[in-house]
């Protein structure tokens, strides 16, 4: 869990950020992918941070503002998708997985491949993970699994932080469905990926190792 003081400081920093910074001269998609979107992304980040801080009413207002903002023609469904992400985060903070999944109903995640690869906002790995967590919590493993599998690091570098947690969840799904060999593969990957992780992440590694020992004993 993030420190509320850190979240508050981040929100203050985003509040002070300009809506329309000078665009870079670079034409590479990695440098220009957010051109014309800074006001939209600033609104999204403020909404997300307020949701994380438990300021649900303010987060909902940011979501509405985001949906009403104009976006470039090549932005696809970005504004609607990110507004859904704000609402889902608010629901997740209140421990309401059904509301999380409802918030994501109708999400399209339409974007060019290059834009999704170059931007965490277009690629939406965080939103995919939040949606998968809610589906798994509701017992909807068949819907959660493809979202977890999509967080492989092959689509974007921004998926990398989610690979190990997604692998743990895929292992749990396989274990629940009686596929011990597959579960063991997922748990082993968690241990390999995060064996040298920082101390706050080690509980996840220990859980994966404990589950690995359990399923190996069941085979």
Outline where the language-model segments fall:
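Amphipathic alpha-helical segments of tetratricopeptide repeats
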Residues: 12-28, 64-72, 105-116, 146-156, ...
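TPR/TPR-like (Sel1-like) alpha-helical repeat modules
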Residues: 15, 149, 175, 180-199
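"A position-specific structural signal for the A-helix of alpha-solenoid helical repeats
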Residues: 38-41, 45, 49, 79-82, ...
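TPR-repeat structural position
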Residues: 4-7, 56, 97, 141, ...
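Structural signature of alpha-solenoid helical repeat scaffolds
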Residues: 34-35, 71-75, 115, 119, ...
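Structural motif corresponding to the intra-repeat A-B loop/turn of tetratricopeptide repeats
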Residues: 1-4, 53, 94, 138, ...
